[in-house]
A protein has these predicted regions:
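Alpha-helix capping at helix-to-loop junctions
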Residues: 17, 21, 113-116
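Surface-exposed, low-complexity/disordered Ser/Thr/Gly/Pro/Asn-rich loops and linkers
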Residues: 1-14
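Extracellular hydrolytic enzyme modules, especially secreted metalloproteases
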Residues: 34-36, 40-203
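Propeptide (latency) domains of metzincin metalloproteases
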Residues: 12-17, 30
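Acidic, glycine-anchored loop motifs typical of Ca2+
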Residues: 21-34
Length: 203
């Protein structure tokens, strides 16, 4: 697991005869928009052991420094996740097909969503306790029901992606919210701090 970007390079080179990578540069900037790899075996994050790859999103060129061109397009952004998981057994004793949750989480990074969990595990890497671990796909929600039932995007995730424009509440009143997965509606309440506000949604 020490060179996951090389795995992506090798996989893409093996697939190059069957895939025209030039079709996957939607904005025509000379860079393949994204590659997603499902790798065989287990995920280190799901109990697979330290020799397994930890599912992640990264970059072949701007991250790992490999200058690889396929069909005239540079290979860069990628994400990956595992075929199997040890979470389902409960005690890590057996392998099962991995749920879709971690795929949804890692693929959402390629849309531009950040992690919402404490990424350095020392309460300084972006901890966001207000999101409720299980309700945010980019926090720990990808592990709901062992990864088989990830949550819908929440209000902040939808706002970042441009899928939701929260309505600002500026006066007292009675307000109604439908479940966010039905119409993407959320409310916003500003605070005295310029860069801080609350988002209200119905899950």
């Amino acid at each position: 697991d020490i060179a996951p970007a090389q795995m992506v390079v090798d996989a893409c080179r093996l697939a190059d005869d069957a895939i025209d990578f030039s079709q996957y540069d939607d904005d025509n900037d000379g860079v393949i928009d994204n590659v997603f790899v499902f790798f065989a075996g287990n995920d280190e994050a799901d109990g697979g052991g330290e020799d397994c790859i930890w599912s992640h999103a990264w970059a072949v060129y701007s991250g790992a420094g490999y200058n690889v061109n396929l069909d005239g397009k540079r290979l860069d952004r990628y994400a990956c996740t595992s075929e199997l998981s040890k979470l389902v057994s409960g005690d890590g004793s057996s392998d099962s097909l991995a749920g879709i949750g971690t795929f949804c989480h890692e693929y959402s990074h390629t849309f531009g969503l950040p992690d919402f969990y404490d990424t350095d595990y020392e309460e300084s890497g972006g901890e966001a306790a207000g999101l409720w671990y299980w309700t945010a796909l980019m926090d720990g929600g990808n592990q709901n029901m062992n990864g088989y039932v990830p949550p819908y995007f929440n209000a902040i995730e939808r706002e970042i992606l441009g899928l939701c424009t929260p309505v600002t509440i500026s006066k007292d009143g009675t307000y109604t919210l439908e479940p966010i997965h039905k119409n993407g509606q959320a409310y916003r309440i500003d605070t005295d701090n310029e860069d801080e506000y609350y988002l209200i949604e119905c899950r």
